[in-house]
Amino acid sequence: MVQSLHEFLEENINYLKENGLYNEIDTIEGANGPEIKINGKSYINLSSNNYLGLATNEDLKSAAKAAIDTHGVGAGAVRTINGTLDLHDELEETLAKFKGTEAAIAYQSGFNCNMAAISAVMNKNDAILSDELNHASIIDGCRLSKAKIIRVNHSDMDDLRAKAKEAVESGQYNKVMYITDGVFSMDGDVAKLPEIVEIAEEFGLLTYVDDAHGSGVMGKGAGTVKHFGLQDKIDFQIGTLSKAIGVVGGYVAGTKELIDWLKAQSRPFLFSTSLAPGDTKAITEAVKKLMASTELHDKLWDNAQYLKNGLSKLGYDTGESETPITPVIIGEEKTTQEFSKRLKDEGVYVKSIVFPTVPRGTGRVRNMPTAAHTKDMLDEAIAAYEKVGKEMNLI
């Protein structure tokens, strides 16, 4: 007899709960800033992607309100019919300047970017070399393309060179692409882009960097590709507009030829209503801020180093992070979730990250310090880590 939907859901939800893999979803009352309120209680927030504090920036709010007054609350259509507003053109021109490319295209989410761009260029006659720790949206985008997917050991340049050589010399594929995150979100390490470019040039690979956690953070704000000075060497620069930029959406930056192709062939662009006017104008304002000043970027890095130093002095394992992302690696899944709950009891909101997001036995809480945190907030968080860590015999 076939299984009912109820039986399937009950069995699998119970499994997740019994194995410490089920995450409860909290509702925030108000804005997602450095401090948040849940069920009437205030917490120091170390779990958002709001790196620069722009999600609550007054200038961005004013820009969004003004755009709503002039352009309405929605774009009204897909981009290819009559949903391309002058605001969208302004945004894409600004993004191209920001990333140092000829052109850019905006999408409704960062996830959409990878679903759109990969499948618009790669197909069943091609191969994609993909870092094993790439984001889920890259994995799904690769699957959608129907290209041969070849997993590459994480940031292992010897493995990349060997697999690139094998794929190219096999003669089986029309195109071969290498895809990597710019900054890996669970550990905070940075892709080895100079070595990747060298290998790509040796074997004629297309290069694709998803800089979701690098845009606004690396390269004085312009991203990981800019950090290494490789803007003219990377074919696809992908980024979100919801993390450091503080709003919503995503983009692809590259040559005009590439962007023209994506506007003609990428399905999320063709079949989904464009970004809302208020969001679009707020994003443009955010990007212009990053181009005009590094103040927020510098404050972010200062706060990140302060938190890392404090946690390391307590004896916590913060991994090999090269960015503001600061994991505290606990290990066992249930212990990790209990640790997160105990920190919450102490007024620090930092979510546990466990399998399948990270490998079994490497559960961690991931701290995301921002430019909006004060040193007093970070001191309070460090004190909570000390108290809970000692109570649980973790330090």
UniProtKB/Swiss-Prot annotation:
Enumerate the UniProt keywords alphabetically.
Answer: Pyridoxal phosphate, Transferase
- InterPro entries associated with the record: Aminotrans_II_pyridoxalP_BS, Aminotransferase_I/II_large, AON_synthase_class-II, AONS_Archaea/Firmicutes, PyrdxlP-dep_Trfase, PyrdxlP-dep_Trfase_major, PyrdxlP-dep_Trfase_small
This entry's Enzyme Commission designation comes to 2.3.1.-
Residues modified as N6-(pyridoxal phosphate)lysine are: 243
First-level EC class = transferase
SUPFAM superfamilies referenced in this protein's UniProt entry, alphabetically: PLP-dependent transferases (SSF53383)
Provide the binding site for pyridoxal 5'-phosphate. Answer: 110-111, 185, 210-213, 240-243
Q: So which domain of life are we looking at?
A: Bacteria
Give the molecular function GO annotations. Answer: pyridoxal phosphate binding; transferase activity
What's the protein called, per UniProt?
Putative pyridoxal phosphate-dependent acyltransferase
